[in-house]
Amino acid sequence: MAVAVASGFWIWAAVLLVPAAAVYEDQVGKFDWRQQYVGKIKFASLEFSPGSKKLVVATEKNVIAALNSRTGEILWRHVDKGTAEGAVDAMLVHGQDAITVSNGGRLMRSWETNIGGLNWEITLDTGSFQALGLVGLQESVRYIAVLKKTTLTLHHLSSGHLKWVEHLPESDSILYQMVYSYGSGVVWALGIVPFSHVNIVKFNVEDGEIVQQVRVWTPWLQHLTGACGVVDEAVLVCPDPSSHSLHTLALETEWELRQIPLQSPDLEFGSGFQPQVLPTQPSPVAPSRAQFFLQLSPSHYALLHYHHGAVTLLKNFPQATLVSFATTGEKTVAAVMTCRTEVQKPVSAGDGSVASFPETSGAQDSLACFNQTYTINLYLVETGRRLLDTSISFSLEQKGTRPEQLYIQVFLKKDDSVGYRALVQTQDHLQLFLQQLAGKVVLWSREESLAEVVCLEMVDLPLTGAQAELEGEFGKKAAIQDGLLGMFLKRLSSQLILLQAWTSHLWKMFYDARKPRSQIKNEINIDTLARDEFNLQKMMVTVTASGKLFGIESSSGTILWKQYLPNVKPDSSFKLMVQRTTAHFPHPPQCTLLVKDKETGMSSLFVFNPIFGKWSQVAPPVLKRPILQSLLLPVMDQDYAKVLLLVDDEYKVTAFPATRNVLRQLHELAPSIFFYLVDAEQGRLSGYQLRKDLTTELSWELTIPPEVQRVVKVKGKRSSEHVHSQGRVMGDRSVLYKSLNPNLLAVVTESTDVHHERTFIGIFLIDGVTGRIIHSSVQKKARGPVHLVHSENWVVYQYWNSKARRNELTALELYEGTEQYNATAFSSLDRPQLPQVLQQSYIFPSSISAMEATITERGITSRHLLIGLPSGAILSLPKALLDPRRPEIPTEQSREENLIPYSPDVQVHAERFINYNQTVSRMRGIYTAPSGLESTCLVVAYGLDIYQTRVYPSKQFDVLKDDYDYVLISSVLFGLVFATMITKRLAQVKLLNRAWR
């Protein structure tokens, strides 16, 4: 009974006495920041009015959002599933309603665009989604037409209720791709049999009855979408590059295609290019405009006019980048973006400042604009005449990128002239919102490639000039070269520099104290970057999936530099390595990015300065073979750059840098350099040893049967982590020594059988040097996804228990015992005994999106697990709660060690969330880095959003808190000094008076 009471007491103590990680209201945003993104635009709709303040977008990240057109901030956002089920297939905006179709045509939703509220949601029948259209009747839009592979359905716009559904004739052989209506009481469905004929079915809007069905032969046409368009009053126009002509068909009256040859010699179809008709329909209750664009090649457009069976050329654009239509009131304009060949004073897309680039580009490539300067002009669609004072010129910072999408927001000014704004999206996922304002063309910009961060590193900022001068005093070279007198003079000069810096800092403090807080500018630019006192401010080097690199200042989230890799394919993999830090002044810091193309397996290296974002003058080696593994060795060259080893598919090693000094060191250290390779498809893990001639030798091999289980994750320890304590003091005052094997690999496997009764998760702890299996365990009736953290002497991994239908965490800890085998040096080749492995499992009440452990400079601070939840919260869980040594029944020794009694449930307390309400949508990873304070760990969580903060696993034991009352303690000290002086004087007077007596 007493044991039960004691156990209950300890459980309640563990639950109630939890370390709080909350923040006060005045601390919100002081040490942390969050940046929200929506992703690359897939569909967009801009309001056509002068006072419009929002634009509605649907993105490739399955996000529907509204952006403030004045600032670019997100007004509201809805994040759907990250899989294909949440993909937005189509979006239409009418008035205050945005209609979206997602999940392959399974869900249709209506959104209120002002506040983002859901008006209605309906589930559609199964079938391949093809097209979406608005259907007008009697000068009002009432219905939504949904075209699928076999059916055409009509739904009420106000409620989403089904009006009628009709099966399409011969849908098993005809591929229906287009739907069209213009308020005449009918709706057309257009389908095609490739290289055969086009089938046109006409439905009555009221009852869905088939009014007419027409079949026309088109032996030259393969697709309707991406080729044909409907112009004027229901006239289908299809280009035919083989006959250099256009084919038209009036859907109301004609039964055969009419061929119209293109008479102009300037209208030549591009070789191997599928020409495309780009029409515009300003209103669903009105016919399409008779004017349309014909795209003849990737950069050649022509504005044509259809009238009574004839097509006339209004304007030819042989070198156009993008085109778009826009309508306001009764005016419809065409926007054309072209590359500006002569650049005088373009406006930079970064900050809007005017710069001079007097250059003239040569012959233009079909898609490239070598000077990266573009111009947008408006043209009247009726005549093709360019409108005066409608030109906007802008330039892109990054070379190799180009605009991909153009959306126009046009409106009428007070003098009845046309004004407009433009939304441009580039190849590197940059969104620019442009306006007609001299000096500030770029109203705002958004770097949406940051919604897909793939790897991240934090680099220490460089020292200031005064700090570098002070550091240089203590070098060995300085002592030899300068001598005693020279060092004394250098000390005086450095102290004068520090005094000058301190004086300017005081002056700035007094100057800012006279201003309101809102007017104090703490702008951070790349020229004033310097390491702070506690090294809390760092440079976040971020690599995105689009091939864009960013340098972000960690304390504010300010983007200081960016670079774009133009030839990176979408599915490439990246690995970022810091070869030289800022600690080796005057040598600049150096980062190396390894990019691997998954299709070809070929890789390339990019070397750059992580502080300034400039490409390095050091030429990396050209990689002619696919790279299997890369290793960053602690070996340095004469310029303090770590050596990078690259292993190709022939198991040959390339060193970078490959100087004579490096090759000599590799020749000496080759017997102690080992690495491993993983072939997940074959289930093979191989260990190799480096030879002195930079070839490799197979040292061990382990095969996991791929027909039974597959390798899903292999993770080693972080090379930068420090372990402060070699063991744990037990209750009897003995020491339980940790098994700190730096070569240990944690390998996670998952069964190939998907039946819930036969699934399992396996974990192997393997020595990467010898291939020895240190430990293996199997979790039966479990499946992934598995999240793993491997640090010090412990491993924590999460999985789904399919039998109990819950998420579980399993913790493993490795110990050598009460006697340490070798305290001075570790060797995998000299370990006769296997370590003791302790294991314990816990129930976690939520699934996990990402998991990482905190890290500090010396490893003294207690470790916490940072767990990203699907809700976007980040839980800071003390590692002590996942201690495998937690006893079921507490003993005197366990109480002496402060071990919490074992309880299988891990409670999630809101006060342990380090990001309070700053949730991170669709979190993919958490990155941790040490700071100059042992108590502080820097954390970056990334996914659709980016969130940066600081955590204090053991509280702030090495720095004063923010609420420390300096005035009070100073007053007390001055009061004590003053009281001491008065008391001393009174005591002297008293002694003098006593002496006179």
From Swiss-Prot:
Cystine connections: 228-238, 339-369
GO BP term, pick one: tail-anchored membrane protein insertion into ER membrane
Record GO terms (molecular function): membrane insertase activity
Signal peptide: 1-23
Keyword list, A-Z: Disulfide bond, Endoplasmic reticulum, Glycoprotein, Membrane, Signal, Transmembrane, Transmembrane helix
Record topology, Cytoplasmic segments: 988-997
Pfam families: Beta-prop_EMC1_N, EMC1_C
Localization of this protein: Endoplasmic reticulum membrane
Segments on the Lumenal face: 24-966
Residues annotated as glycosylated: 917
KW Cytoplasm (keyword) present: no
InterPro entries, alphabetized: EMC1, EMC1_C, Quinoprotein_ADH-like_sf, WD40/YVTN_repeat-like_dom_sf
One GO cellular component term noted in the UniProt record for this chain: endoplasmic reticulum
Membrane topology, as annotated: Single-pass type I membrane protein
Transmembrane segments: 967-987
Subunit organization: Component of the ER membrane protein complex (EMC).
Family as reported in the entry's similarity comment: Belongs to the EMC1 family.
Main function: Part of the endoplasmic reticulum membrane protein complex (EMC) that enables the energy-independent insertion into endoplasmic reticulum membranes of newly synthesized membrane proteins. Preferentially accommodates proteins with transmembrane domains that are weakly hydrophobic or contain destabilizing features such as charged and aromatic residues. Involved in the cotranslational insertion of multi-pass membrane proteins in which stop-transfer membrane-anchor sequences become ER membrane spanning helices.
Cited PANTHER family: ER MEMBRANE PROTEIN COMPLEX SUBUNIT 1
Protein name: ER membrane protein complex subunit 1
Organism of provenance: Mus musculus (Mouse)
